[in-house]
Amino acid sequence: MTVMEHTKAATLDLTKHGLHNVKEVVRNPSYELLFEEETRADLTGYERGVVTELGAVAVDTGIFTGRSPKDKYIVKDATTEEHMWWTSDTVKNDNKPITQEVWNDLKELVTNQLSGKRLFVVDGYCGANPDTRLSIRVITEVAWQAHFVKNMFIRPTEEELATFEPDFVVMNGAKCTNPKWEEQGLNSENFTVFNLTERTQLIGGTWYGGEMKKGMFAMMNYFLPLKDIASMHCSANMGKDGDVAVFFGLSGTGKTTLSTDPKRALIGDDEHGWDDDGVFNFEGGCYAKTIKLSKEAEPDIYNAIRRDALLENVTVRSDGSIDFDDGSKTENTRVSYPIYHIENIVKPVSKGGHANKVIFLSADAFGVLPPVSKLTPEQTKYHFLSGFTAKLAGTERGITEPTPTFSACFGAAFLTLHPTKYAEVLVKRMEAAGAEAYLVNTGWNGTGKRISIQDTRGIIDAILDGSIEDAPTKHIPIFNLEVPTSLPGVDPSILDPRDTYVDPLQWESKAKDLAERFINNFDKYTDNAEGKALVAAGPQLD
């Protein structure tokens, strides 16, 4: 076996991962080598990348243009039995159990697929704090998948590579599928499976890059909270004085837009931990949505799409130009790039001190929630567990009505412990740091229009500069929220949502409807004492 590597690290023995007769190992290749490898003329199908006019390579991930949660399984054994938040008949989630026997079959499939091949091995870190990071090894036969991993995880130095030992191994066998899935009781021939005793993830059948990124996020979500370290689906930034803010929010709530602020340096845009030293990024890159991307609206992301960035599922015209408006393949078009493609970032390491502001973003299409309210510690836990947002969905009659989404901890798909554990650890960290929490509605109000980005930015500025603390407040019934009555640079007529309705009774009836949905959703957390104690912090109906 020859080893070709960008580093001078020792020859790798892949037999310990069950791989045999490997022809060649390309370890931690340079971006130049990856560019050559992923655009080779002899590549076919989903392996081949095309060069765009912006310099970035674009790839097609096939039928999988997003994660496949129905194909996610975790081995149920002595390691995971007690702590894992397993799916159940009463509360469904994505943590479905499989046996060691099924795992053994799937591992044989993937190792057979990768054995005897020329392989790319990318070693990196998940977590910017050396004390708590996971050392990740990803093994794949596909060059662009190695490129994705190099972009998204933290890139080690030559010295670190020389002594690198993986804590977790990801074997990506995207080209193989599982012929025995039906008799094994699985969802399909494709699979994304985890074994926490072996500390290994196996991927088969899906080419979507995000399975590797979010797979490791799910693992950080398992290991860190058990050490009392918060693991968070959020963006984070830092002010000139070192003050740190974190922004939680589901897709479409403004998490990336609002944390990308010319006045503040970006720590990271998606996954963070919070330990005794402060807030730290898990990643070494960003994975941004590109649908309808324009240079004018989002210059930072647009300018990050250059050589070494990797585009997924965008429409590339024959002249190499990109049609970012075309969602015919998927609305989930993406780009991964190393974080240093963004100019205003925290350097040299993506971490900051303790957060003093925690912001929950909800886009409320019901038009009920106030644009901003300050939360008590109990309300913080309640709204964190609720993870609410709502979209306007068209019905067959052409009427648009709101569709609520409740996603625990603003990231239910990636949770591996019971949601109350994340709430408990977050609030513990907040209380130790004296941090305040705010619920910010970036959605709609009684005017039928979305709250303007200018008003929302004014609200965020007032939270971050502390001026919201000096504002007079009033109480909003049903949701039991305290809201400011005036803020600098914000239209005062929107701060009490009732004032945006011609008839205040209309707000009340909508508020009762939404409150009932909150209450029904929260029922599932009342299966333990921690959850029961929080019911009083949520909306109340007489």
UniProtKB/Swiss-Prot annotation:
ATP binds at residues 214, 233, 249-257, 298, 334, 450-451, 456. Keywords: ATP-binding, Cytoplasm, Decarboxylase, Gluconeogenesis, Lyase, Manganese, Metal-binding, Nucleotide-binding. Its cofactor is Mn(2+). InterPro entries: PEP_carboxykinase_ATP, PEP_carboxykinase_C, PEP_carboxykinase_N, PEPCK_ATP_CS. Pathway: Carbohydrate biosynthesis; gluconeogenesis. GO terms for cellular component: cytosol. GO terms for molecular function: ATP binding; metal ion binding; phosphoenolpyruvate carboxykinase (ATP) activity. It holds the Pfam family PEPCK_ATP. Substrate binds at R67, Y208, K214, R334. Binds 1 Mn(2+) ion per subunit. Mn(2+) binds at K214, H233, D270. CDD domains: PEPCK_ATP. Its EC number is 4.1.1.49. It is an enzyme of class 4 (lyase). It catalyses: oxaloacetate + ATP = phosphoenolpyruvate + ADP + CO2. One of its GO terms (biological process) is gluconeogenesis. Its main location: cytoplasm. Involved in the gluconeogenesis. Catalyzes the conversion of oxaloacetate (OAA) to phosphoenolpyruvate (PEP) through direct phosphoryl transfer between the nucleoside triphosphate and OAA. Monomer. NCBIfam families: pckA, PRK09344.1-1, PRK09344.1-2, PRK09344.1-3. Belongs to the phosphoenolpyruvate carboxykinase (ATP) family. This is Phosphoenolpyruvate carboxykinase (ATP). It comes from Vibrio parahaemolyticus serotype O3:K6 (strain RIMD 2210633). The gene is pckA.
